[in-house]
Amino acid sequence: MIKVSTEGLTQRYDRFVDDCIIALFDKEPADTDYNISITLKKFVGDNGSHAGFCLGDEESSEIEVATHWMYEDDEVVPYTDFEIAGSIAHELTHAKQFARGQINMVNNVWKTNDLSTDCDHLPYEEHPWEVEAYAYETILTDIYWG
């Protein structure tokens, strides 16, 4: 069972999270035990430059999603509800990848279909886990938020 706890999310975001969990984790075995904690906070990262972040392993993930970001002149800019939903979908995709053992917090290796691929040489946006997360970010927000 996928257990999700949230902090700072409105009811609409909670419904969106539920829809994303069903879409992302539908192929997991029935006896899967995985815990996901999602916290909505004003800023993520030291300088408010991240829209979201996911730390995890094969047992649980901790997700933080920002409601605002810091512009170069220290101007505080709010994310739109749609952008926040996109960040939630993106980070939930990483939680799925952690749960399946496809990624870890140690190295830049992508594991899928019993193959491991070293991705140290790839730019950030070409890492397979980011390609998948950006794709699901778009798909899930278009289907369940739009």
Predicted segment positions?
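Post-HEXXH active-site segment of zinc metalloproteases
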Residues: 78, 82, 98-130
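Surface-exposed helix-capping loop/turn segments at secondary-structure junctions
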Residues: 26-34, 102-104, 144-146
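Charged phosphate-binding loop/patch that engages nucleotide di/tri-phosphates or the phosphate backbone
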Residues: 2-5, 138-146
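Active-site scaffold of zinc-dependent metalloenzymes
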Residues: 43-82, 95, 99
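An active-site-proximal "capping" alpha-helix that borders the catalytic cofactor pocket
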Residues: 128-141
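Auxiliary, metal-adjacent structural segments of Zn-dependent hydrolase domains
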Residues: 2-61
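Active-site catalytic microenvironments for nucleophilic, acid-base chemistry
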Residues: 95-103, 139-143
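Active-site recognition of the HExxH zinc-binding catalytic motif
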Residues: 86-99, 133
